[in-house]
Every structure is written in C-alpha cells, then in structure tokens.
Amino acid sequence: FDDVFFKCIDEKLSGERHRSKYRFRVYNNDFDNIKFEIKIKNNSVSYKKTFLIQKELLNQIIDNYNFSLSDITDKDLKKELIYLKHSNYKPKSIINYERDAFKISNNFFRITFDKNITREISNKDFFNISTQKQKIFFDNKVVMEVKFRNYIPTYIINIFSKYNIARSAISKYVLANKFRDFSNDRDIISETF
C-alpha cells in the first residue's frame, strides 16, 4: 500500500531515517491468516507492528475503506486504518516469493532467503494470484535478510567476513516498482514469463 505520490518508495530511496511501510501479507495462500504489517524504521532500528485481520476486512479496505470503525475493537488497528484511509493509501503492488527461514533457538537471530521474487502485472486482486508475473531479478538473485535483536553471533560474522558478505539496503517493494511510470501510475514494461 502506498499513497498517490508513492511516499513509501520516495522515503526509502531518499534514505529517510524515520519511515513506515504498510503491507498485507499471507503465507502459502492461507487467506484465513492475513497479517496487516507496519514496518517502522527509526534510524538503524527496524521493528514491526502486526495485526491479524479477516479476509472480509481486507476486502473492505481494498474497496475504498468501506468498513465501519465500530466493528474494529483493537484500538491500535483502528488508529492505523484511520491513518491509511485519510492518507489515501491504496494497493500498489502484489509481490510473490518463496522464503526459506532459519533461526537460532533461544537467540533472537534469523536469516531468510527470498527467491523467485515476482510481481503481479495486471492483477490487482489480492485473493486471486494470476499467472502474469514479472521477475524482479532477471538473473535469479536471492535476497538474504539477517534479522536480530541485540547482536549477530560471532561465528555468523566470521562466515560473512569469509565470503565478503556486506550489508546493503534492499526493498522488494521498491524493486517491484522499478518499471512503473509514476507520473500516471502505469507500467512501462509488462513483460511476462
């Protein structure tokens, strides 16, 4: 989700130190467990607010926020949805990928590998994944994300050093929109595979 000016993309690309990104997420096409996530970045610290929502509510949000606030009991969720509605946030991209995740037990540390990252080209229906997809990377790159709370274990740092793995900022959302003509919100390239 983004506003008409693509504020989330603009803030990411300009390196805004305090920013938020809004998304709805499902795993393995399980639409009974939809997550509304707000990814918040404050300087170098990132964290998420997560709300579980029903499919009906997401449909109402997509349908121009056609829901009753009195039906939403969670005060924090209500506050966030009011912000999205008043800021005119709309669905902009549907991004699909396969994820392998690994974590160290009893340590707030995990590594994920996202591959086969694609975006929907013409489909705006969140619940009906189309076959018209566009690869984000044309050379089958994999995105590795390292997530940790306080520190990265020393042996992991040693592995990163051995293979010259350097930190870089990547956004699947920004990459998914690299072919979009933002002047009138249309795709420049609609090459499918």
Write out the residue ranges for each language-model feature.
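Phosphate-end processing signature that detects enzymes handling 5′-triphosphorylated RNA
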Residues: 1-193
